[in-house]
Regions:
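Terminal transmembrane helical module of multi-pass membrane proteins
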Residues: 121-198
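Hydrophobic alpha-helical transmembrane segments and adjacent interfacial helices
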Residues: 21-28, 49-65, 86-94, 111-125, ...
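Membrane-interface helix-boundary motifs at transmembrane edges
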Residues: 29-43, 95-103, 155-167
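A cross-kingdom feature marking solvent-exposed beta-strand/loop segments within repeated
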Residues: 61-76, 162
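N-terminal topogenic module of multi-pass integral membrane proteins
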Residues: 1-61, 191-198
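Transmembrane alpha-helical segments of multi-pass membrane proteins
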Residues: 39-51, 80, 104-116, 168-178
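Membrane-proximal helix-loop-helix units in multi-pass membrane proteins
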Residues: 70-144
């Protein structure tokens, strides 16, 4: 007898949380001028970025959750795919020490997509109750975090406090809150799947 298939959403959410957590600590370390700590994020970012990209690709194109009645392939799979890709690109750019170019602007475009997803969740009533609150928290904080990535064009001055440094800390907090929402949803999904498999 084979075990019933349970969708991979739980681990995808944990992968998303790991990715946004890496992004959050990039801004934290950058605000403090800790270049060695930023360099230490490169390999985890590439690894988690690959996982998020492949997970998003699988959800977007194989669509393992047809019975849910909600288009999670567009709502979650597509932005996860693009997030993983941007995480890899960002890590390679840091590793190669090249200028940011348009990369932060690509993050803004993804943030707008995620913000549109948040609006759709509410307007189309795709989630209800506790799921609505956590989903909206995840989408809104991740969208704002993605839209604020262009602050990376401005470098905080070492050993000085200023608006740019504070903005880096604000971005760290926003991405950190998004990370917590992803972890909460992922851990609750794991428990739910284990307690009532299909």
């Amino acid at each position: 007898m084979t075990a019933p298939f349970v969708d991979p959403l739980a681990i995808m959410l944990i992968g998303l949380a790991m990715g946004t957590g890496i992004g959050a600590f990039y801004f934290f370390y950058a605000a403090r001028g800790q270049k060695d700590q930023i360099a230490s994020l490169v390999y985890p970012a590439i690894g988690i970025g690959l996982f998020d990209f492949m997970s998003g690709f699988y959800m977007s194109f194989a669509w393992p959750m047809k019975t849910f009645g909600v288009p999670y392939n567009m709502l979650f799979g597509d932005p996860l795919l693009m997030f993983g890709l941007l995480l890899i690109i960002g890590a390679v750019m840091i590793y190669k020490n090249v200028k940011l170019g348009i990369m932060p602007l690509l993050s803004v475009l993804l943030g707008i997509y995620v913000l549109d997803g948040a609006y759709s969740i509410s307007a189309l009533k795709l989630e209800t109750g506790q799921n609505y609150i956590t989903a909206m928290g995840l989408y809104i904080f991740d969208a704002i975090g993605a839209i604020l990535v262009p602050i990376a064009y401005f470098k905080p001055e070492e050993r000085k406090s200023g608006a740019i440094k504070y903005m880096y800390y604000v971005e760290w907090i926003i991405l950190g809150i998004g990370t917590i929402f992803a972890l909460v949803i992922g851990y609750l999904a794991l428990y739910g799947h284990l307690s009532s498999p299909p």
